[in-house]
Amino acid sequence: QIYADVKTWCICKGFVDYICPQLYYSLDNPALTFEDSLTAWSELDINKSVKLYVGLAGYKANSDADEGTWLYSNNILADEYKTAVNNEKVSGIMLYSYSALKDENASTEIANLTKAMSNNLDTENQTTVPIQ
C-alpha cells in the first residue's frame, strides 16, 4: 500500500520543491467547490521553500463533468485562475491536460483562461507560454 504524507512533505525542508494538488472541481461542484478545496490546501503549514501550485482541470472545460457544472460558463478556468493567484500562498497554476489546449469543445474556455493570464502577467514573476 502506498502512503503519501503530504503534510510532512510540506513541513520538512528538502522533501519536495513544490506540491500541486489537483483541484479539478468546478466553482459549483456539489461535492466540493474549487474555493473550499483551495482554502484547505492553502491552510496547510508549508515550509517557505515549498511552493504551492494549483492544478486546474482543462480537460473538463465545456463537458458534463461534475453533474454538468462545467457547462454553465465558459469562464470557469479563468475564474479559478484569478481565485488561485489572488491567494498569497499560491505560486501559480498547472493545467491538465495538454490536449485541452487543442480541444475544439474547450476553445472558448481556454481562450478566456489565456486572456485572464495575459491580463495578470507580472513579467518578473510569471511566464506564459504561447499556445501554438
Question: What is each residue range found by the language model?
Answer:
Residues 7-30, 44-131:
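Substrate-binding cleft of secreted/luminal carbohydrate-active enzymes
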